[in-house]
Amino acid sequence: MAPNPRKSHPLLKMINNSLIDLPAPSNISAWWNFGSLLALCLATQILTGLLLAMHYTADTTLAFSSVAHTCRDVQYGWLIRNMHANGASFFFICVYLHIGRGFYYGSYLHKETWNTGVLLLLTLMATAFVGYVLPWGQMSFWGATVITNMFSAIPYIGQTIVEWAWGGFSVDNPTLTRFFALHFLLPFLIAGLTLIHLTFLHESGSNNPLGIISNCDKIPFHPYYSLKDILGLMLLLLPLTTLALFSPNLLGDPENFTPANPLVTPPHIKPEWYFLFAYAILRSIPNKLGGVLALAASVLVLFLSPLLHKSKQRTMAFRPLSQLLFWTLVANLLILTWIGSQPLEHPFIIIGQLASTTYFTILLVLFPITSALENKMLNF
């Protein structure tokens, strides 16, 4: 019998073992679809971004008008830009749901996969931030100024780091040029990290909703999960194209229709909606360094998840108290997102401070205590 090139060819063999003959648990739900959706988001963003970069000029005098030119004069330029801008929002929706699923079902116990995932999140956040600056609108400029200025809170070397990042004494042409270079480069770093993420995942195999070892009951990835993923892709592309075609500016900031002006500060500086929860945590501490540390901790706390797992059960499927706590955390994050979009005045300040405190308390204190309590209740 002739050897099957799919199983013997060095390159095809790798693809086969990752996407075709990969043994997958038979009971993974739609919550496991988000990995492939994120791959689709990344591919879409790289493709649309490449097409946009062909028409973009990274210069403070031309950036804003080059984006307008893309939308007005380039064939389907408006569609490419709208898909890219709203694709970022859907990218983050998928990322947050993917992390939430990992947290709910205890997937963080695959430590290497989880840690590379958190690194991916940090890289994605950096990419989105530098990308937001490129259209050179008012909110782009002032967002860049405010967020990069945070690094000046680092004792002794802070101001030097900020001026080095800016390429001068304020956000100006050198800043825009380097941000464009970084925005072009980082998605390929994300693609590389994704391969590492997948390598670690396929080393241990996927988790499943029951949180038990599923070696005795595996099915091939293709055709079962490949078809399931295609359904997921369709369900993702439908709202994305709907948003891009019917209401492309829904999630954007109206300030960005005004070209950047260093002499006029917008009444309320805020980042894109997917960073608002972290922005609310940053603003809830009335000290610059404290705020920056809290901002960093709001994402870096995910690295501690494997260490804070005290339950004898892996998933939350059979842990009602932890479930209640998990959904409280979700509600808390939604409150933080809302607070981040509001001006810094009463009662939003105190709500933000309470929500920020609750966020860290749930993750660092209440989850381990609840897990230990559930172990005791179940006589583990």
Curated annotation (Swiss-Prot):
It holds the Pfam family Cytochrome_B. One of its GO terms (biological process) is mitochondrial electron transport, ubiquinol to cytochrome c. Binds 2 heme b groups non-covalently. Keywords: Electron transport, Heme, Iron, Membrane, Metal-binding, Mitochondrion, Mitochondrion inner membrane, Respiratory chain, Transmembrane, Transmembrane helix, Transport, Ubiquinone. It is found in: Mitochondrion inner membrane. Its cofactor is heme b. The chain crosses the membrane at residues 34-54, 78-99, 114-134, 179-199, 227-247, 289-309, 321-341, 348-368. The keyword Protease does not apply. The keyword tRNA processing does not apply. GO terms for cellular component: mitochondrial inner membrane; respiratory chain complex III. Its main location: mitochondrion. It is a multi-pass membrane protein. GO terms for molecular function: metal ion binding; ubiquinol-cytochrome-c reductase activity. Heme b b562 binds at H84, H183. Belongs to the cytochrome b family. The cytochrome bc1 complex contains 11 subunits: 3 respiratory subunits (MT-CYB, CYC1 and UQCRFS1), 2 core proteins (UQCRC1 and UQCRC2) and 6 low-molecular weight proteins (UQCRH/QCR6, UQCRB/QCR7, UQCRQ/QCR8, UQCR10/QCR9, UQCR11/QCR10 and a cleavage product of UQCRFS1). This cytochrome bc1 complex then forms a dimer. This is Cytochrome b. It comes from Oceanodroma melania (Black storm-petrel).
